[in-house]
């Protein structure tokens, strides 16, 4: 398997619950390394740009409002098969459908306030990492 990088957001609901460390520990315990991390408050423009692919969908306004409702942690994770591994750790988008022991099953409130975001492909990971991090901000460990 190849070493990959993936992008992760710990969303406002999880930051508000003070579970940043618990979520990051799950990534690390699964063999993923944090190679870049920022705690930040997204502006409306940043959230709209990041989620532009959903701009025509009915939930777009609510998504932007939620993602700007409090600070988030944006991270780059690195490891073997990082994209699939992160998605497995996160669990299903709807926490009611997420397997026990996944991040969303344990920390998410709803399908909207679902604790984390993770890239779903190599192309998405590259785009999402570049959206929030300059190449010089991502390290190798």
Swiss-Prot record:
Gene Ontology CC: cytoplasm
UniProt subcellular location: Cytoplasm
Keywords: ATP-binding, Cytoplasm, Kinase, Magnesium, Metal-binding, Nucleotide metabolism, Nucleotide-binding, Phosphoprotein, Transferase
GO MF term (any one): nucleoside diphosphate kinase activity
Catalytic class of the enzyme: transferase
CDD domains, A to Z: NDPk_I (cd04413)
Entry EC number(s): 2.7.4.6
Catalytic activity of the protein: a 2'-deoxyribonucleoside 5'-diphosphate + ATP = a 2'-deoxyribonucleoside 5'-triphosphate + ADP; a ribonucleoside 5'-diphosphate + ATP = a ribonucleoside 5'-triphosphate + ADP
GO BP, sorted A to Z: CTP biosynthetic process; GTP biosynthetic process; UTP biosynthetic process
Domain of life from the UniProt record: Bacteria
Essential cofactor(s): Mg(2+)
Residue positions binding ATP: 11, 59, 87, 93, 104, 114
Active site: 117 (pros-phosphohistidine intermediate)
UniProt-listed InterPro entries: NDK-like_dom (IPR034907), NDK-like_dom_sf (IPR036850), Nucleoside_diP_kinase (IPR001564), Nucleoside_diP_kinase_AS (IPR023005)
The family this protein is said to belong to: Belongs to the NDK family.
Quaternary structure, from the entry: Homotetramer.
Annotated function: Major role in the synthesis of nucleoside triphosphates other than ATP. The ATP gamma phosphate is transferred to the NDP beta phosphate via a ping-pong mechanism, using a phosphorylated active-site intermediate.
Entries under HAMAP family matching the protein: NDP_kinase (MF_00451)
Protein name: Nucleoside diphosphate kinase
């Amino acid at each position: 398997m190849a070493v990959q990088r993936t992008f992760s957001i710990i969303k406002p609901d999880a930051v508000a619950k003070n579970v940043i460390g618990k979520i990051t520990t799950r990534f690390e315990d699964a063999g993923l390394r944090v190679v870049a991390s920022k705690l930040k408050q997204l502006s409306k423009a940043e959230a709209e740009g990041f989620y532009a692919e959903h701009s025509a969908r009915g939930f777009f306004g609510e998504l932007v409002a939620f993602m700007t409702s409090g600070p988030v942690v944006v991270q780059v994770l690195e490891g073997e098969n990082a994209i699939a591994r992160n998605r497995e750790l996160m669990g299903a988008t709807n926490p009611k459908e997420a397997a026990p022991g996944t991040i969303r099953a344990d920390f998410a409130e709803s399908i909207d306030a679902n604790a984390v975001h993770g890239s779903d492909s190599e192309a998405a990971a590259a785009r999402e990492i570049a959206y929030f991090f300059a190449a010089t901000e991502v390290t190798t460990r």
